[in-house]
């Protein structure tokens, strides 16, 4: 019950006329169904003939105007999410059904506020299904990079024309993409094509980022006849430096004098912390 109003109270006016006005004590809720019941003893005419009243829920019922703006209930990625895929869609879930109106959704880079992509809400890259809006950027996000999303206040309305306030703050919906870049070999000792290499030298591999030892072999082969000098499982004690950018390989024996060798590395040998693999 929203309000019970005695017919004789000051909230009921118009006695002695054909029009009765009822003034409830408070404001009705937005977008809400109500019905009115009236006691059969509430109103009489001048000859004491009584109005029959209303006792059911259908004779006098109504729905109030929706005056509540839609709000953002959740998003994917969530605010402050990390490890987001570089090809991810942005999904906005609202408190009620919305329609795309006008304006843009803008994806910006956190470091310098540069615009990665500005997408008009009427574009086919923005799809609306009831209260869910899916944004499919045209490009691929950069790896290990912070972004934030701006939504114009004119972008989405509910069916009653109430507008979503939009997103204007840099910190309201921001996320960081995951590392999707494979580690690369930056340099080595000996260098490729080196001559005069010491017979007892270790092989040192310097990577573009820290790597972990995984599985597979490092094989040192004599180039002239493809004879294998040493096959070294990466998990053996002869391979050190896991978790760093520098891997050191200590062959079991001494290399032959004045002999050309080449090194092969399994593609499964080294991964970075997010399991991106060195190509080998």
Task: List each language-model region with its residue ranges.
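Short intrinsically disordered, low-complexity coil segments enriched in acidic
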Residues: 1-20, 130, 279-280
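Acidic, Ser/Thr/Gly/Pro-rich low-complexity segments and short DxT(G/T)-type signature motifs
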Residues: 1-5, 28-30, 39-83, 104, ...
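Short, surface-exposed alpha-helix to beta-strand junction/turn motifs within ectodomains of secreted
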Residues: 1-12, 41-44, 58, 86-126, ...
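Aromatic sugar-binding surface patches on proteins
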Residues: 14-22, 128-135, 241-249
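Solvent-exposed, conformationally flexible loop/turn segments
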Residues: 15, 31, 85-87, 144, ...
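Acidic, Ser/Thr
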Residues: 25, 95-97, 138, 208-210, ...
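Short beta-strand segments enriched for Tyr within beta-sheet-rich domains
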Residues: 34-38, 94, 145-151, 207, ...
């Amino acid at each position: 019950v929203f309000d019970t109003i005695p017919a004789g109270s000051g909230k009921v006016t118009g006695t002695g006329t054909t029009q009765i006005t009822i003034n409830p004590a408070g404001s009705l809720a937005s977008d809400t169904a109500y019905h009115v019941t009236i006691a059969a003893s509430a109103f009489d005419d001048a000859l004491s003939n009584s109005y029959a009243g209303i006792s059911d829920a259908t004779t006098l019922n109504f729905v109030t105007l929706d005056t509540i703006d839609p709000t953002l209930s959740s998003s994917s990625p969530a605010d402050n999410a990390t490890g987001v895929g570089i090809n991810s869609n942005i999904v906005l879930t609202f408190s009620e059904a919305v329609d795309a109106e006008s304006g843009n959704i803008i994806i910006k880079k956190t470091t310098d506020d540069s615009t990665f992509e500005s997408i008009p809400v009427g574009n086919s890259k923005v799809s609306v299904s009831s209260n869910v809006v899916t944004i499919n950027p045209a490009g691929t996000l950069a790896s290990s990079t912070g972004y934030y999303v701006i939504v114009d206040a004119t972008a989405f309305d509910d069916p009653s024309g109430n507008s979503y306030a939009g997103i204007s703050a840099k910190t309201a919906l921001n996320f960081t993409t995951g590392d999707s870049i494979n580690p690369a070999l930056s340099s080595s000792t000996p260098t490729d094509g080196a001559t005069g290499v010491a017979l007892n030298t270790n092989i040192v591999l310097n990577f573009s980022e820290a790597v972990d030892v995984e599985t597979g072999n490092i094989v040192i082969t004599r180039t002239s006849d493809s004879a294998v000098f040493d096959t070294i499982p990466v998990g053996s004690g002869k391979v050190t430096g896991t978790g760093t950018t520098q891997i050191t390989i200590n062959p079991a024996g001494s290399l032959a004098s004045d002999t050309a060798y080449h090194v092969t590395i399994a593609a499964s040998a080294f991964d970075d912390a997010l399991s991106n693999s060195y190509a080998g």
